[in-house]
């Protein structure tokens, strides 16, 4: 039998009142990415035909933040329950496809669990995702007869026997489009809250003689939703520890897996060592034997073999060659490219600059919009003056150039191979090969000088 097409509905219209935030709840982040984006990425990996995103509160913000996502935006103008949300999406359902309902505030659901749920769906019935809890207090209980689900009973409506049930409803379900549209049209809001509940389709399916089965998730955290910042923080730490464990199993040496954050994708070689409180963002690749010191932040970087990044350095969109030494307290900004065996020291900032093989910028310097050749020494306090208040200009430094301390290189300027710039010089004109350039205020010696003294108050 031909496999049915799959469409996804992600419910994301809630206000998230308990977050105490102007930001829509589903846009709050786990591992640097909005919760709903985690869900979207997961369903994209299972090749859904359509992704319907039901939105309401903060719709303009959501559409702006998620403008590149391949979703069909479905407005739920009034939040009248989960069933009502699904009713808004129902006109887009095809009769001959499966419809999988998810929640935008459940970011940790995995593709494997969803595929298991879809595979379990009866031909014209419903498959629910459930989980067994030691303490199910507060959750809707799954009531079964002969293995099939006949009802979901909320805590307040459960009798003594039903309260003993430990299997609870996660809210995730899959059904075929034709049947689901029928059941959604039959929902009523005849309840204390005056809302339309998706759970009522279970009774409607049973009335039609359709089978309702339940698939149990192995890990409650996978289906945990977020209603407040405490829950958000709990999911963040769980997810980070899970990522850290995966890296440990892959051979990365983490000094403390509880104090490591991965907010993107990390690829790595062998014998990588990462100290505490390191943050990885975006796409980062680490070569073999890379060492990262405590408190470093790397975002969208490529790091070569045998590089050492010393504590509290910040690297963003940088490419670092083999055996480079960086830090402590260095900053590499976007557009930085360090060749092999370069040294970037403490309180040095590099921006949109190429530093050649073996060159050193070791202390208290700013190098921006520049090309630095091989085997150069850039002394302490050197500044490339690249901005005139309106435009940026480039500094070009050839090979084997020595730049002394406290030098200002006023761009645009070129310093050719082998030149030497004396300490305290302000360079405003090009320097030829092997020249020595010095520009200083003449030194004066004043004999008998006395320091001023403080005047006493009368």
Curated annotation (Swiss-Prot):
Gene Ontology CC, one term: membrane
Region Linker, annotated ranges: 230-250
Gene3D superfamilies membership: Hexapeptide repeat proteins, Spore Coat Polysaccharide Biosynthesis Protein SpsA, Chain A
Keyword Signal: no
Subunit structure: Homotrimer.
Region ranges (N-acetyltransferase): 251-458
Protein name: Bifunctional protein GlmU
Organism ancestry: Bacteria, Pseudomonadati, Pseudomonadota, Gammaproteobacteria, Pasteurellales
Primary location class: cytoplasm
